[in-house]
Every structure is written in C-alpha cells, then in structure tokens.
Amino acid sequence: MGPPKIGQTVVVEVPSTTANIGPGFDCLGAALDLSNQFTIKRIEGNAERFELIMESTEGNHLRGGPENLFYRAAQRVWRTAGIEPVALEARVKLAVPPARGLGSSATAIVAGLVGANALAGYPLPKEKLLELAIDIEGHPDNVVPSLIGGLCVTAKTASDRWRVVRCDWDKSIKAVVAIPSIRLSTSEARRVMPENIPVNDAVINLGALTLLLQGLRTGNEDLITDGMHDKLHEPYRWGLIKGGLEVREAAKAAGALGCAISGAGPSILALCKATKGREVSVAMVKAWEAAGVASRAPLMSLQLTGSECISNTFG
C-alpha cells in the first residue's frame, strides 16, 4: 500500500489538562481551555524524516526526530492502520508550557495520533486512539481528557481493559492555575514517591475522590473542600515545588475551595467560585513572588470538546 492520498495538511488543536486534582492519582483529569495548535504537513523525504518547528521560546529545547513523542504517536497510527508512513512537518503554536504539570506531553501524543489519523482518512476510531494514547503515555489521566475533553475518570477493569467515564462539572466551579517559571519533570516527581503505601492512606483517597466528584457534579463547596485531600502523591511532591505550600495556603485564604498540585507539578490548581477567581489568582501570584518565583495564574474553564481537527487540506 502506498502513502495516504487523502490529506496533505491538517491543523489540530489539543487542550491542556490538569491531572490528579488531589485524590485522583493517575486516574482523574480534566481538559482546560488553554490549547496547543499543531499544523501537520506531509513533506518530501523518507518516512523517518520529521521536522519540528516551535513558535514559542518555551519549546526551544524540543527537537524533531524519531524519539519525539509526536512522531512516535503518528508512527503508531500508520503501523496500526497498516499504512505506509510518510515524512512529516509539525509547526506548533505552543500555549501550554512544558514541564509545568499541564499535560504538554499529552498534547504532543494526542496531536500525533489525531493528525496522522486525519491525514490517512480516519482509519482508526477514537476508541483505538484512546488505547494508543494511554499505551504511549503510560498513564491515562492527561491523554484521555486531552483527546475527548471534559472531566474524565479512567480505570482498568478486571478484564484488563481501559474504561473511561466522563463526569459532570458544575459550571459555577472555575479553575485558577498558577503556572510558575520553574520546571519540574514528571520523572523527577515520580521518583520521590514510595513503591508501597499504607492501606489507610488508600482508603482516605478513595473516600476523598468520591466526595470530590460529587462536589464537582453538584457545585457543593463543602464536598469539594473535603474532597481535595490526597495521601498518595502530594505529601511527597510538595517539597519539590519552591514556595508551593505557601501558594496553596494563600489561595485558600483568598477563597479557594481547595488546592492541588496540577499533574506532576509545579503548577498549582485552585478550585473556586467564579466570583473569587481574581482574588485567588492575585494571592497565588503574590505568594510565589514572595518566594522568589515569577508566575501567572489564569482563570480557566473546563474544555468540553477535547482535541479537534479544525482544518484538513486535501491534495
């Protein structure tokens, strides 16, 4: 079979994500309304050629080539669909900063899957793309909401299948995400976690996750506050984030219902009513400034559509 004849250039938008949201370690994540845009183009050359063009200084350290996450994801689509690969160029308008706990790696994986699938004429269903995304990333909490949008719980069943459930999020609840200038890699954040956890800590998290999901569904402030409590990963990770605990306490004092490390960090998520958004944002930025860390703290909403192919040029 020759190269795909349908697509020449596709433009894909992929949202950022906040994962874990406190007690939902490696299973809970939400898509947010901050997105990366990927313009993906077939180019001349052998199938191993991949050119990456970053339209942001934040991504200057990222490189093309066979180890790039986008490239690996695109290749998985070709192989799975039985299609001969083609050389690609990806031009990225980067709005989601890397190594900040906002799912930047997930956006690359999802863009590679969705873009390659679109170029090939959509041979794979979204369910298969979900499976591939989780396999490449290694955990589902970022890639799943990045692909399908919304607030998602992803669990592995007794039959070793992934099951995804989209949960309700009351519109009155907003997310303030304090994004610092410092970086923290996911691998570093995972290294500090213990291999085993006490049963009591697991029980606390199970209860907290139930409270949080019910609070987000109904907009119940007390349930959100009681539910944003974690024993599995945050106690080990706060020490990696300079000024993080002070930022958390400042957000709560300003009216946040609860705070959590966003993904692996170092960004910090605060949930609040929309009327408290500005106060919480200002408080978090000031607290980080006092610790000698520059930051910004935009007020964000849930992104419901997930990744979208907004343009497909046929050639």
UniProtKB/Swiss-Prot annotation:
Q: Which residues bind ATP?
A: 97-107
> SUPFAM superfamilies under this entry?
GHMP Kinase, C-terminal domain, Ribosomal protein S5 domain 2-like
Pfam families documented for this protein: GHMP_kinases_C, GHMP_kinases_N
Query: Catalysed reaction per UniProt?
Result: L-homoserine + ATP = O-phospho-L-homoserine + ADP + H(+)
The principal location of this protein is cytoplasm
Q: Which residues form a coiled coil?
A: none
Q: Which UniProt keywords apply?
A: Amino-acid biosynthesis, ATP-binding, Cytoplasm, Kinase, Nucleotide-binding, Threonine biosynthesis, Transferase
Q: In which pathway does it act?
A: Amino-acid biosynthesis; L-threonine biosynthesis; L-threonine from L-aspartate: step 4/5
Top EC class for this record: transferase
* GO cellular component terms attached to this protein's record: cytoplasm
What the entry lists under InterPro entries is as follows: GHMP_kinase_C_dom, GHMP_kinase_C_sf, GHMP_kinase_N_dom, GHMP_knse_ATP-bd_CS, Homoserine_kinase, Ribosomal_Su5_D2-typ_SF, Ribsml_uS5_D2-typ_fold_subgr
> In which domain of life is the source organism classified?
Bacteria
Reported function? Catalyzes the ATP-dependent phosphorylation of L-homoserine to L-homoserine phosphate.
NCBIfam families from the UniProt entry? PRK01212.1-4 (NF002288), thrB (TIGR00191)
Query: Which family does this protein fall into?
Result: Belongs to the GHMP kinase family. Homoserine kinase subfamily.
Q: What is the name listed in the Swiss-Prot or TrEMBL entry for this protein?
A: Homoserine kinase
Give the originating organism. Answer: Prochlorococcus marinus (strain NATL2A)
